[in-house]
């Protein structure tokens, strides 16, 4: 794949690349929508990646061609936020570059290819942000850590791209393997590598494409953080991690009246989900995969009933994620586990499938949702990396 990528770079830019970089997609294993409330998560890098062949150029322009899209050229001598670039690739390039300006910015040409498909639930945007951060970090000899590169990606997405997001996606992509993250202090998150070999669990991790895209769903995601912030304000706090659960339940009638029932239910989900992360982490540390799966099921139920990130508001005829969850549960027949992961509302769901059921399970999913809808994942040990210095 690297050789093909280098050839495509040469054909497009008329010269040979100097480097090849890679950043993986990720899957959230535990902690749905807890990261933006300074909570806890478990996540893993997966064997889907965004690759870039790169060569420096003489100026301060980043010329980036991504397969299937038009060439994007961004002069990073200008690092101001451009309102017209909101929700664009250009905004991410400028946003990531802004955090490297003290190292003397250099322009580069990049040919990008990816099998972390947009809307796949594997966080293609985070993989792209980590890829950009890894490129700048190397070509400028900036010496940023994997954690710092993740934080830069989140900053670019929040401030330049205009999408509120937590830090889990970027952290999992940047660090790699299976990790537990405590975001109590997001400036200094506690990242703990998990010494667990998923391949020995007796299960396969499957990601199922529901067929629903993330277009026009930014308001749905923003509503979650907005409603949780409203709850926090009643307690004089900014994030739910800092709100005492006992105080929340003592004043729950007041919270319902001030914020509405959906906000209350979403807060209950976050309180309980943080506890589940700790219990799942303990189960993994003790090699107790059955207990881990028990809490996967609980997480999925809570996301659907309380967090309510399965069906977008007002959607009646199209409820693709809900259908995919129901289909997967039917095919599993009480075994394994299934849950919505990541942002929810669209994209993919996650299933833990017993090895003896994988073939029949994927066939059943593909029959109902279309060929290739069920993808079997493996855990990738590396995060964002320099793959090759080209000769």
Label the predicted regions.
Residues 346-347:
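Active-site pocket scaffolds in enzymes
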């Amino acid at each position: 794949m690297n050789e093909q990528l280098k050839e495509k770079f040469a054909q497009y830019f008329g010269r040979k690349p100097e480097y090849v970089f890679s950043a993986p997609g990720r899957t959230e294993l535990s902690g749905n929508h807890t990261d933006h409330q300074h909570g806890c998560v478990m996540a893993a890098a997966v064997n889907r990646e965004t690759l870039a062949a790169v060569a420096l150029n003489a100026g301060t322009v980043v010329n980036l061609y991504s397969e299937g899209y038009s060439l994007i050229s961004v002069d990073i001598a200008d690092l101001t936020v451009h309102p017209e670039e909101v929700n664009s690739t250009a905004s991410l390039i400028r946003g990531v570059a802004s955090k490297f300006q003290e190292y003397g910015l250099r322009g580069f040409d990049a040919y990008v290819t990816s099998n972390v498909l947009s809307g796949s639930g594997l966080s293609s945007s985070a993989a792209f942000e980590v890829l950009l951060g890894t490129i700048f970090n190397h070509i400028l000899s900036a010496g940023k850590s994997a954690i710092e590169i993740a934080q830069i990606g989140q900053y670019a997405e929040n401030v330049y791209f205009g999408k509120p997001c937590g830090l889990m996606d970027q952290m999992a992509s940047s660090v790699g393997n299976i990790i537990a993250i405590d975001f109590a202090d997001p400036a200094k998150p506690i990242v703990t590598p998990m010494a667990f070999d998923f391949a020995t669990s007796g299960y396969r991790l499957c990601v199922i494409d529901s067929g629903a895209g993330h277009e026009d769903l930014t308001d749905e995601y923003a509503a979650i953080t907005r409603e949780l912030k409203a709850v926090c304000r009643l307690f004089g706090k900014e994030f739910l991690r800092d709100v005492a659960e006992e105080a929340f339940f003592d004043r729950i009638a007041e919270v319902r009246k001030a914020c509405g029932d959906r906000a209350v239910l979403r807060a209950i989900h976050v309180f309980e989900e943080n506890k589940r992360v700790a219990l799942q982490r303990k189960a993994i540390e003790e090699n107790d995969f059955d207990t881990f799966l028990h809490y996967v099921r609980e997480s999925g139920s809570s996301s659907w009933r309380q967090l309510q990130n399965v069906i977008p508001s007002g959607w009646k005829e199209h409820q693709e994620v809900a259908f995919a969850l129901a289909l997967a549960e039917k095919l599993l027949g009480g075994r394994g586990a299934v849950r919505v992961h990541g942002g929810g509302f669209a994209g993919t769901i996650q299933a833990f499938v017993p090895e003896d059921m994988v073939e029949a399970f994927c066939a059943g999913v593909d029959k109902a949702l279309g060929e290739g809808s069920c993808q079997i994942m493996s855990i990738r040990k590396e995060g964002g990396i320099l793959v090759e210095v080209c000769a």
